[in-house]
Amino acid sequence: MYQSKGKHFSLILIIMAVIAAVLPQSLFAQGESAVPFLLIAPNARADGMGEAGGALADDASAAFWNPAALAFLPGQEISLTHSNWLPAFQQSDLFYDYLSYRNNMENIGGTISASVTYLSLGEFVITQDDPTPLGTFKGYELAVTAGYATRAFDDLGLGINLRYIHSSLAPIDVQQQGREGVASSVSFDVAALWKPKSLGPLEDRLSIGLNLSNLGPKMTYIDAAQADPLPTNLRLGIAAQIIKSEFNNVNFVVDFARLLVRRYPSDTVKDAQGGIVSISDPRVDDLPKSLFSAWGDHAFDKVTIGTGIEYWYGAPKLIALRFGYFYENPQFGNRKFLTFGAGVRYDVYGFDFSYLSAVEENHPLGETLRFTLLIAWGQ
């Protein structure tokens, strides 16, 4: 028997079921995909605009939203984001951290980046049935990413990321199947960002980004037959600077994202009397087939939409206010929330925070706060 700070081990099942609220997940990721933590918005700025950052990615967090955007950024920057994750569970040791760094290097003709994503699932107590404590373990998930971006043309940036993923849900054989709840994999991202230089009134005001992320082999917790795909995700982002003046600037952003995972339901074999003879494991398409077959499963109904607006005051930019909205089809996750945010910039320092207000009452993501600190120099 396993307990987390006095609560039954089944709590971790619930936590994993709503992490990132992608789709229901069981302990060993028997839902739409494994490691959904890779889809969590990693910075307060984009989160304050409805989790839309695919085109307005002009800081170190671009390594997540669109690594190609790093090709347009001079100098160096380091940023750190922290969030107490799923505050409805009131677990102080359930948190999310994201550390990122970028450096534009003229001698290699582009920008290098590195980031670390860490999700703590908390500490759990191993007990006997009486229950006598036998020990503890901590569940966590980790990703380490390195990237490179360069300009193919003056108005077109290209980027790539390479990533190592480690998931340690339980370093013990919870399901008594001879395997621990631990798995690792690798993945890569490819991205492009277009910033047109000659579009009349939209010159230097429009950005269009495309990012295909988390391409890689499946995660295997139990055995190869039960392996689950990574959350391969396609993101299209559009950003426009709708007001541009010396002291007042307004940005509008919208992102469309689609999980490119195709899972088929289990096949049930029945006898002549209608009794169940066997149930097969769900079938999942491998890459690259899933990049295309996923669209055969409610093609556009599974597209999520995030949109927002950002107002900056100051010359240079000093104070920002942000507002956004995120929508997901009720049949495929039903995430609907408003987001609010603010930020300040002074010299090389910056601070952003965001607040998520879920439309659905008592949603696990409701009242989520993110805080981001950043330092940028050599601009």
Predicted regions and their residues:
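Subset of outer-membrane beta-barrel
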Residues: 28-379
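Short N-terminal leader segment in a subset of presequences, especially plant chloroplast
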Residues: 8-12, 39-40
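Nuclease and nuclease-like effector domains acting on nucleic acids or nucleotide cofactors
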Residues: 6, 15, 237
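N-terminal secretory signal peptides that target proteins for export/translocation
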Residues: 1-9
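Bacterial N-terminal signal peptides
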Residues: 12-24
